[in-house]
Amino acid sequence: MQVLYEDNHLIIVYKEAGEIVQADKSGDIPLSEIVKQWLKAKYKRPGSVFLGVVHRLDRPVSGLVIFAKTSKALTRLNNMFRNGEIHKTYWAIVTRPPFEPEATLTDWLVRNERQNKSYAYNHQVPTSKKSILHYKVINQTDHYTLLEVNLMTGRHHQIRCQLSNTDCPIKGDLKYGAPRSNPDGGISLLSHRVEFVHPVSKETIRVESPLPKDNLWQAIGNI
């Protein structure tokens, strides 16, 4: 686990592809528990440690995760997420270059709970939710393209689904049309940067994620 920012109210850590943020049916140790144990050891606390999950990343996604260290910070950060006051920027490596180097995508997404998958439509349909993101090309190699993605809405698998719908699936994302998986089982989607006004101190917090260690990320992401 890599800690990238910490104060008395919150902690921001790097999640590797394959890790889960919260406990689920898999029985794997979640990142939240790893962070709790790290805090407990660091501050030599004999009892339980409070840690609030503010948001999640899909298991195959890597990058920044914010946790609250107090109940007050958790409430405020939850409200900030709800009001769009925490700005998250993603980097995605896609297997085909998009038709336009920069664009805003608007789709209507329907979530299929049984399949754990979302489907995109170009018009409103029953149970669909309007989904908007903006992307721009920031680097390319012979075979892959690196996009910077900003979400205007927060839907289930939104980036994965909308990019796939433009015939630009994320590298390794078999569920959304990538031709093959990544060796580590993850997908090439990185929660790269978060920026927000601190819920208590009111200072501007800006944190960037390190790049995943694989060779493609190191080659295409060092810009």
Protein language model regions, located:
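RNA pseudouridine synthases
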Residues: 1-223
